[in-house]
Regions:
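Extreme N-terminal starter segment of soluble prokaryotic enzymes
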Residues: 1-5
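Conserved alpha-helical elements of sugar-nucleotide-dependent glycosyltransferases
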Residues: 18-26, 76, 144
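N-terminal strand-loop element at the rim of the active site
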Residues: 9-15, 29-71, 165-166
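A short, charged, and often flexible helix/loop element on the N-terminal side
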Residues: 56-82, 134-141
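An aromatic- and histidine-rich active-site surface loop
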Residues: 74-85, 95-128
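Membrane-proximal helix-turn-helix segments that form the acceptor-binding/catalytic region
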Residues: 141-161
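A generic structural motif
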Residues: 33-39, 93-94, 120-121
């Protein structure tokens, strides 16, 4: 059985946007496929309980989203990645695929890729366009996004793009 860990969406069931709808539909369409087991990181507020639940036959694990402003998505992705690495180790999962949606954690990424590789896994990334080009970000934030994207593209095993423009 192929274990696929999905990090970077707010979670399922979908109630936010594109990535969440993608993950919701992916797990729905494959819920009876006994050759794939999905594990999905789901964000919960800091005051909520963590734990696991099953949705569309996917194992969903709750990761607390810290209230630290704009950086909360970065910390959430790192916390989900830590959880995933520990879960793979604890359960002796061989050849896991860790699929990361968006390029938020580039400066921290290589360390986790090495850990996943040492456990026999692969890391796939969906870059989600060029976040660093968006007008809403200040110059320092744009620099971070550009660096982050470059590092994640460099260290991933496979890029999965859903747009020709990417």
């Amino acid at each position: 059985m192929q274990n696929v860990f999905i990090i970077g969406s707010k979670g399922i069931p979908a109630s936010y946007g594109g990535y969440e709808t993608f993950v919701d539909k992916l797990t729905e369409y494959h819920q009876t496929n006994d050759k794939i087991k999905y594990h999905v990181a789901c964000a919960v507020d800091d005051n909520k309980e963590v734990g696991e639940f099953i949705y569309h036959n996917a194992q969903c694990f709750k990761i607390k989203r810290k209230k630290i402003g704009p950086a909360q998505a970065i910390v959430y992705d790192i916390d989900a990645l830590k959880y995933t690495v520990n879960y793979i180790k604890k359960n002796n999962i061989d050849k896991a695929i860790v699929y990361i949606l968006a390029c938020r954690i580039g400066p921290f990424f290589k360390r986790y890729v090495k850990q996943i590789h040492s456990l026999g896994g692969k890391v796939y990334v969906n870059p989600d366009g060029h976040e660093w080009k968006r007008a809403k970000w200040s110059a320092p934030v744009k620099m971070y996004w550009k660096l982050s994207e470059r590092l994640m593209v460099k260290h991933s095993d496979l890029l999965i793009c859903d747009s020709k423009n990417i």
